[in-house]
Amino acid sequence: SSDLYIPALKGTDKERVTIEELLLHQSGIPAFWPFYKEAIDKDSYKGTFYKARPDASHHTQIDVRLYVTDKFDYRKELMAKSFSADYPLQVADSMFLHRSFRDSIIAQIGRIPLKDRRYRYSCLNFMLLKEMVENISKMPMNLFLDKEFYKPMEMNRTAYLPLRQFKKEEIVPTVKADYLRKGKVLQGYVHDESAAFMGGVSGNAGLFSTARDVAKVYQLLIDGGVYNGKRYLSRETCDLFLTHTSKISRRGLGFDKPDVNNSVKSPCTEEAPEEVVGHTGFTGTCAWADPKNHLVFVFLSNRIYPRPFDHKQLMRLNIRPRMQQVMYQALMK
């Protein structure tokens, strides 16, 4: 159960949530929680923070029917303009959060009331799994993954906090004017608010990579844990993650899967066999491993540039499944 690996959950209604429930998104934890609001000075803006329509104090559009207040500030004790031991969590250029904020997010998750145990996709599940990785490995997750997987697998273009290793010009910009980051261009900083306010390293978002590097991870999985002659995972672990499925949803452990009963709701093309595992991403990404045909399909785009609501056609027109379909149709010829 979760409290064995995350002491902060002891005594909360999350302490009996299992790792399997987190991986299947059946933990009962809500789909979303605006952690960043705790860092905002409530007295720095008038009225409500968000509005469905623009008005005199809400001009900045952040979604199809959502506008944010024009002016707000962060709490001075939580946000600084330069790095220090007390403010190490970089959210954007010249924006550093207090070190206590990361722990306060986990404490907040502990306090959020659980809902029923039906399937409910939630980033919070994977934020908790990241805490488990760190508490078991006794290392920050980015350093653990670097040491155990990315460096030995020569995934040289894969990193959390990529600006520590790469020039800004080498990184595709994610969003043009992020309202939580004072209208700055996000280039080399994670877009997802929860991951950003964790300092850029999270279980739900924050990893920068290339299609070639992502493919290596999926190749490792369908090759039973071996890559380039070296074993990284046991065959049993790979088999478990490739075959274990939920009894109440289409999901696998940590992975999404084709919906063989409902092609309209499926994240994959109809031609994809039920053995396929993978994931889609909010910023316009997807990666799928097909152990049956020994295929890996990776597609990376920056859908949310310049604005998060500009390219929703990627979903509406089913671009990712249709690209996958072309691949399977080519196999059948």
What are these model-predicted stretches?
Residues 8-9:
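Aromatic- and kink-enriched transmembrane "portal" helix at the membrane-lumen/periplasm boundary
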Residues 12-274:
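Short, surface-exposed loop or secondary-structure junction motifs
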Residues 225, 279-333:
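Structured C-terminal helix/loop/strand segments within mature extracytoplasmic catalytic/sensor domains
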